[in-house]
A protein has these predicted regions:
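Single conserved hydrophobic/aromatic residue that forms the stacking wall/gate
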Residues: 1-10
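Hydrophobic alpha-helical transmembrane segments
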Residues: 11-56, 61-62, 67, 71, ...
Length: 172
């Protein structure tokens, strides 16, 4: 019973902690005014980059994909698709930097690339877990989409990585 309880605790933290970190991106303290300001753009940008990366990787991989990324884990992902997804995210980061200039273009590009790398890693990690457990989908709440975890697997590693990236960038 304690093994089941600890497994549930780890699972819940694995999913809940990254999404709780979205608050770090959304709320910014203003020391001069002694209050916090809310900005939804940074948390939303993580999801935009994830969606652009997934869509760009899928389309590029379908057109040009020849070299498998990690065939044993996710047989349909290719290096060409992964690079294509990254290129589409860089384009999206230029657009975001134009419409939301509170960060430089370079910081937006760095954020996009951070999300690409860690989002892909999160997707592969979840695919590996499912493969090891012998399950196809992580749930049936979204028929044909593999479950809720499949919709957000990229964000589970991308959000903490984005928080660390933006914190490190703010130090320099």
């Amino acid at each position: 019973l304690s093994l089941v309880g600890s497994e549930m605790c780890i699972r819940d933290r694995y999913i809940a902690l990254p999404f709780a970190l979205l608050n770090v991106l959304a709320f910014h303290s203003d020391e001069t005014a002694s209050l916090s300001q809310y900005n939804a753009i940074l948390p939303l940008s993580i999801f935009i980059f994830n969606w652009v990366n997934d869509t760009g990787a899928y389309c590029t991989g379908m057109l040009f994909g020849k070299h498998k990324l990690f065939e044993r884990i996710s047989p349909k992902k290719s290096w060409e698709g992964s690079i294509g997804g990254g290129i589409f995210c860089i384009i999206a980061s230029f657009l975001l930097s134009h419409f939301f200039p509170f960060m430089s273009t370079g910081v937006w590009i760095g954020l996009a690339l951070t999300v690409v790398v860690f989002g892909t890693w999160g997707d592969l990690t979840e695919s590996l877990l499912k493969r090891r457990l012998g399950i196809k989908d992580s749930g049936n709440i979204l028929p044909g989409h593999g479950g809720m975890l499949d919709r957000f697997d990229s964000a589970i590693l991308a959000i903490p990585a984005a928080v660390v990236y933006l914190y490190v960038v703010s130090l320099f």
